[in-house]
């Protein structure tokens, strides 16, 4: 089962997506990031999608949703 690691580095969560992000994995990632933000209360969340070859409209919406959730929970979000 594929998973996207969420690493805590100081006051920042780093999410580095290095696998093909299919719909089910993207939805699971949204929940995992929300849980990690609630648990660690980071100042920022860095989402690295440089390893993703194709970002379709669904994946784009899920990434936007993840960013919106993190911002609502008080974290700044950077997508690279």
What do the predicted segments below correspond to?
Residues 2-31:
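STAS-typified acidic loop motif
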Residues 34-37:
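Conserved alpha-helical scaffold flanking the Walker A/P-loop in AAA+ ATPase domains
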Residues 39-43, 47-80:
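Amphipathic alpha-helical interaction surfaces in cytosolic regulatory modules
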